[in-house]
UniProtKB/Swiss-Prot annotation:
Alphabetical list of PANTHER family matching this protein: PHOSPHATE ACETYLTRANSFERASE (PTHR43356:SF2)
Keywords: Acyltransferase, Transferase
Taxonomic classification: Bacteria, Bacillati, Bacillota, Bacilli, Bacillales
Organism expressing this protein natively: Bacillus subtilis (strain 168)
Pfam families found in the cross-reference section: PTA_PTB (PF01515)
Annotated GO biological process: butyrate metabolic process
UniProt entry tagged with the keyword Acyltransferase: yes
GO molecular function, one term: phosphate butyryltransferase activity
EC numbers for this chain: 2.3.1.19
Name this polypeptide is given: Probable phosphate butyryltransferase
Amino acid sequence: MKLKDLIGKASIHKNKTIAVAHAEDEEVIRAVKLAAEHLSARFLLTGDSKKLNELTSSMQGHQVEIVHANTPEESAKLAVRAVHHKTADVLMKGNVPTSVLLKAVLNRQEGLRSASVLSHVAVFDIPDFDRLMFVTDSAMNIAPSLEELRQILQNAVHVAHAVGNNMPKAAALAAVETVNPKMEATVNAAALAQMYKRGQIKGCIVDGPLALDNAVSQIAAAQKKISGDVAGNADILLVPTIEAGNILYKSLIYFAKASVAAVITGAKAPIALTSRADSAENKLYSIALAICASEEYTH
């Protein structure tokens, strides 16, 4: 499966509305136009109405609704409110700082806070690689505890299910594949593997600790005599800290030239999270991923 296949999967889910917080950005609007064309999605755009009317002048009236906002903070609040009141299905980050958007998301009155940990799931389409790779969490949780890691992994499993991988293989990553009490990542990874065996993590297969090479390469796993369903075949890479995840994320983009879609999950609705450096195509993939993930919230 490739990221472009998400377009077909998302297009099955008709009449989804995406609320875009502070959509005053040409690349964001390009992605909005592509999504309106290919996904039959509708958009609620918050921001300066004059600028947004100019940017969306070529779109049909039924495809877009514009809600005026004077500041990024107001834009974020209005977009989140629309999802909170179920007039939109998905929230999308526009030209607004992530911290501002998340402040609105976590508002106790009209936000999207749930009992779950919020976490970031990135889905990579890597050239010459035979499957999509899910990486979590490279953007939200700095140094998650064991219980937070369990929830982060479970969030990623829900996203994998949403795109059609019904039993993903998850590798709890560390620097080495043996347990070392002085290396917390190896201890947590081993605990997660045991939690899976005891039924505390569902909908996937978990192993760890695994180093990156023997998680994704069957050759590397065989050389180190590491066996099991996950070794060499991982779909989900659960990183121990935000530093490890962020470096892996950017390495895949800048060195491996991977395409990426990203979503924040664990809230009451999925959040398509894109960076300003993302192309319109990658933003489109994130919208498609969030639409697919939104179906998990209805079941």
